[in-house]
Amino acid sequence: MNIYRTHTCGELRGSDVGKEVKLSGWIHRKRDLGGMLFVTLRDNYGITQVLANPGTDAYKVFNDTRIESVVTVEGKVLSRGENINKDMPTGEIEVEATSVIVQSAADVLPMQVADDDNAPEETRLTYRFLDLRREKLHNNILLRSKVIAGIRKRMIEMGFTEFQTPILTSSSPEGARDYLVPSRLYPGKFYALPQAPQQFKQLLMVSGFDKYFQIAPCFRDEDARADRSPGEFYQLDVEMSFCTQDEVFEAMEKLFVSLFTELAPGAKVTGPTFPRISYEQAMNRWGCDKPDLRYGLEIEDVSDIIAKTEGNFLKGAIDSGKAVRAICVNNVGDKSRKFYSNLEAFCKENGAAGLATLIYTDTEVKGTVTKLLNDEVKAELKERMKAQSGSAILMVADEKLKASVILGKLRIKLADELDLREKNAFRFCWVNDFPMFEKDEETGQTIFSHNPFSMPQGGLDALLNQDPLTIKAYQYDIVCNGIELSSGAIRNHKPEIMYKAFEIAGYDKSVVDEKFGGMIRAFRFGAPPNGGIAPGIDRITMLLANEQNIREVICFPLNQKAQDLLMQAPAEATEKQLKELHLKIVE
């Protein structure tokens, strides 16, 4: 028999009235009403109201004990009668305390637990163990556990096998800075913490395993963002042998539709398949490679219509080789001039020369360019953009991609301001056909645009005969509600193709052999075609929890400066430790 409790704090119901029970938990709140002391007791499972009568030992102990102290309460379950609290699962009952034992007394709290008091992030992270007691954050972490358990169950049901890959490995050029671990036995040499288990999961396919998955920790020395935690993160790492891109898509669609339907009951979830959007389409129609499909405002190229006009700056832009692209916003015909001037200022902040507007009403067409365009052009624009009375067509003239990117940012701003996003919905899509290479803006060098291990479309022939910037890769992202959940690819499993791809990106054969020698050697002994993907656990949970910041779904995250305020990391090493590792700190 458990000496601390007979029931949890979320367990008792009306059917338990009259029972003698024992509960243990944290003192959540205390209220003195007419001499009667009411205490809410909290544990992992819920809250139960406890009452202590004046003059009793229980009353004295509760009265002398601070909020958030841990206590064990013995007492009798009573009915609340007509005073039921319908907001609590245990709201039909209360426990009349006959004995209270303090298991651990709390000091004065540096932050409130029972109330969301908007404590500074520094305080929350320094006292994360208190922060994690708060209901919302506590539930987020429990949801994260359900996400991982649900993923594991479904992956096994689909025939995948779970593996564990090394944490200490070698450094590789995968796009972010490595965390390095100095070797004690080999002076001057370092291990690296894996940015991802990329090489190991491909080696498992070469080893004859068929379907791999792992809830994998990944380590990248990169700056924080709202949707990216510095230091480390977890991903569902997946790899499949003898698969095509479509088969990877099918497995992930099955996983996500089922998982989100279970963990977000009542929500609208895209399915059973997800729309497929090429990278080029995404940039042209949404102005980014992470389209949010919960609202419209798709970008259209209206250059052909504007080209029919004369003597205006829009036509001048087209004549100089630029494009005019547009979005249509409904129900904004009555917005003030300031509303539109703010939109133009936003576009200018993001690199536009200006924002051209046409505002359609029942009787006229207003806006900054209405006098520059004839009635036929305005009517054609209205038809192309599916505008109606109260709609506004917003146009940017610039280089094709730049115009789309500016409008892409504008559509996000409008969705925020006008509350355009579909509620309680998870709208998934695939973005595929990414470019294999891109130009580095600073150096002008050709570099990999995404995953260097991807198979180029067209294989070795494309690498030998095409302009590298025109080559597409078998790369794909899964996006939900404008958030990239994962990147994936069909892998390059042929050494000759890998050498050529890295050569184009500026890597000598000797560098490839040094950095990826283990994988290259393996590929010379028979490697199956393989592909995979790696959705982020943190971002999946963030979506399901409806959180805007990824730190709200991680137990012990680093702060924006990559510091662990609770454990005081990073910390200085001792002279003894440095000596053992053959290191010296140089000022």
Where are these regions (language model features)?
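Class II aminoacyl-tRNA synthetase catalytic cores and aaRS-like
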Residues: M1-E587
